[in-house]
UniProtKB/Swiss-Prot annotation:
UniProt-recorded name of the protein: Replication initiation control protein YabA
UniProt cofactor note: Binds 1 zinc ion per subunit.
Subunit architecture: Homotetramer. Interacts with both DnaA and DnaN, acting as a bridge between these two proteins.
GO BP, sorted A to Z: DNA replication
Positions with a binding annotation for Zn(2+): H90, C92, C106, C109
Any one Gene Ontology cellular component term annotated for this protein: nucleoid
Compartments it resides in: Cytoplasm, Nucleoid
Keywords: Cytoplasm, DNA replication, DNA replication inhibitor, Metal-binding, Zinc
SUPFAM superfamilies on file: Myosin rod fragments (SSF90257)
Length: 115
């Protein structure tokens, strides 16, 4: 293999690595968007369930409390964590908790929100 062939192969490899980096970054951004949307929809869904539950309680007061089916509501702390994450702070367990993310997404934080 002569120098020119070696140089061309290195250039092709560099181009492939750059393309992989770009693709990985795009996939990460898409994943973050989807997880954030999922968390927002879960919170909205739980709020709607809570609202429906209150409405059903006022309409169906004759039901016995033992027979009434309660829907599990999200903890207010999870809502607070989601709010802190949207404001740009780490909510993942460990030494990063409470530190500013500087506009970067954190997969560990998103994992906490998705649990």
């Amino acid at each position: 293999m002569n120098r020119n062939e070696l140089f061309e192969r290195l250039m092709k490899l560099e181009h492939h690595v750059e393309q992989l980096t770009t693709d990985m970054s795009e996939l990460k951004d898409l994943t973050v968007e989807l997880v954030e949307e999922n968390v927002a929809l879960q919170v909205e869904n739980e709020n709607l369930k809570r609202l429906m539950n209150k409405t059903e309680e006022s309409v169906e007061t004759h039901l016995d409390k033992d027979n009434y089916k309660h829907v599990k509501t999200p903890s207010p702390s999870k809502d607070n964590l989601a709010m802190l994450y949207r404001e740009g702070f780490h909510i993942c367990k460990g030494e990063l908790f409470g530190k500013h993310r500087h506009g970067e997404d954190c997969l560990l934080c998103l994992n906490v929100l998705s649990d």
